[in-house]
């Protein structure tokens, strides 16, 4: 009972929202990319031509070597020659260009997210009115109201949809949004959550400078893309089609790694600092992170069983994938999905790991494997990014006989 100022009494009502019964499932996945394709072997010439930097011969030679070793064959980007010619401040390293970038990003990031969301909703096969929550994630531009609001308008979602906007989390955020969606779905019976990650390199594209060699790493790796998922518990029989279950999720910060990955919004856009120590930091800590996850999930951690799990790893770059593979003694096929997405799209920041998840389930069906997780039952999803933050999820696959994609 509560006593108010007028000495009247009121009764607290019991909590009415029920928890879900079963585990949270991925019910659909959609993706999208801009139309402009850049082949990695040709990108150094394009990059140094468009930024008028061919006089920096040694820097160009270094960049060419970086692109050759990137594990990337091609990338998709919103930017093209026409955009960069029309807005020369973007292609300069030092010019003030934040306003120009922002004006484009606040329009284009939600638009690309909408294409991915439309694809996910089409696969899901249920009316948009059944969406109860929207989570939107981007590190590309900031505005109020945010990209979540813009996407709600573009999709024609109900104005009462519960929205969560996740800004500036970087490469690990594809896992973060699934951790948030898991908590929402578990605690709100019948909820259906639309999760969208959309990123454009327009926020960080700029010409080379000898003062910031790390800038070249980002220019060699990053690509544009959007991914969308429908997430919910207790799939409706014969109406919804689960491809994975999310059973455990946690966020961790690697010790003594504060400056390994940082991004700062400046007048010339998002300036990234990517340390050479990132792969070593991940390699040195991956055993501890996985031990905690697997012990809590399975009451035991057997390092020899790592190859009995499927691996959905953020395709951040070949050195990161090499570090995980080597430290865990993984067979090369365990990182195939991540390397394939890196090869075809580059590092798309938050959507990248979700592209890996989509690729894995479709390949598993196409190759007639027994489960959506490459024929294996349990798997690990890993995201790495600023902090140095590591997101870890434990997933369970479903039998491919029970899963269909169109």
UniProtKB/Swiss-Prot annotation:
CDD domains xrefs: CHS_like
Catalysis performed (reactions): 3-methylbutanoyl-CoA + 3 malonyl-CoA + 3 H(+) = phlorisovalerophenone + 3 CO2 + 4 CoA
UniProt-annotated catalytic positions: 171
Coiled-coil regions, chain positions: none
Annotated GO MF terms: phloroisovalerophenone synthase activity
EC numbers: 2.3.1.156
Name of the top EC class for this enzyme: transferase
Keyword field contains Lyase: no
Pfam families: Chal_sti_synt_C (PF02797), Chal_sti_synt_N (PF00195)
Alphabetized UniProt keyword annotations: Acyltransferase, Transferase
Highest taxon listed in the record's lineage: Eukaryota
InterPro entries for the chain: Chalcone/stilbene_synt_C (IPR012328), Chalcone/stilbene_synt_N (IPR001099), Chalcone/stilbene_synthase_AS (IPR018088), Polyketide_synthase_type-III (IPR011141), Thiolase-like (IPR016039)
Similarity remark: Belongs to the thiolase-like superfamily. Chalcone/stilbene synthases family.
Described function: Produces 3-methyl-1-(2,4,6-trihydroxyphenyl)butan-1-one (phloroisovalerophenone).
Name of this protein: Phloroisovalerophenone synthase
Source organism phylogeny: Eukaryota, Viridiplantae, Streptophyta, Embryophyta, Tracheophyta
């Amino acid at each position: 009972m509560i006593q108010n100022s007028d000495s009247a009494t009121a009764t607290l009502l019991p909590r009415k929202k029920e928890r879900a019964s079963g585990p949270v499932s991925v019910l659909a996945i959609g993706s999208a990319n801009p139309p402009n394709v850049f082949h990695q072997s040709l990108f150094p010439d394009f990059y140094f031509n468009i930024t008028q930097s061919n006089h920096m011969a040694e820097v160009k030679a270094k960049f060419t070597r970086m692109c050759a070793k990137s594990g990337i064959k091609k990338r998709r980007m919103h930017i093209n020659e026409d955009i960069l010619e029309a807005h020369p401040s973007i292609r300069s390293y030092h010019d003030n260009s934040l306003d120009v970038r922002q004006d484009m990003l606040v329009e284009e990031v939600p638009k690309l997210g909408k294409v991915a969301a439309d694809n996910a909703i089409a696969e899901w096969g249920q009316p948009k009115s059944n969406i109860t929550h929207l989570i939107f994630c981007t590190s590309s531009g900031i505005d109020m109201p945010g990209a979540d609001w813009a996407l709600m308008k573009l999709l024609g979602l109900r104005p009462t949809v519960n929205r969560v906007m996740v800004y500036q989390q970087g490469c690990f955020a594809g896992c973060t949004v699934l951790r948030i969606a898991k908590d929402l779905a578990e605690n709100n019976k019948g909820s259906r959550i639309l999760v969208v990650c959309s990123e454009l390199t327009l926020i960080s594209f700029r010409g080379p400078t000898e003062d910031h060699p790390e800038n070249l790493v980002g220019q060699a790796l990053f690509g544009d893309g959007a991914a969308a998922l429908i997430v919910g518990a207790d799939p409706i029989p014969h109406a919804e089609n689960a491809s994975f279950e999310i059973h455990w999720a946690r966020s961790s910060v690697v010790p003594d790694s504060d400056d390994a990955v940082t991004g700062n919004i400046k007048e010339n856009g998002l300036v990234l600092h990517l340390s050479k120590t990132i792969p070593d930091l991940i390699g040195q800590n991956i055993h501890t992170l996985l031990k905690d996850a697997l012990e809590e999930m399975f009451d035991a951690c057997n390092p020899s069983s790592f190859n009995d799990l499927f691996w959905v790893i953020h395709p951040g770059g070949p050195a990161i994938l090499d570090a995980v593979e080597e430290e865990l003694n993984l067979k090369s096929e365990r990182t195939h999905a991540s390397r394939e997405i890196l090869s075809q799209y580059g590092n798309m920041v938050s959507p990248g790991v979700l592209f890996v998840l989509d690729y894995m389930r479709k390949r598993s069906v196409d190759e007639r494997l027994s489960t959506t997780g490459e024929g294996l039952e349990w798997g690990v999803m890993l995201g790495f990014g600023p902090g140095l933050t590591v997101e870890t999820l434990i997933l369970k696959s479903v039998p491919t006989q029970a899963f269909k994609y169109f």
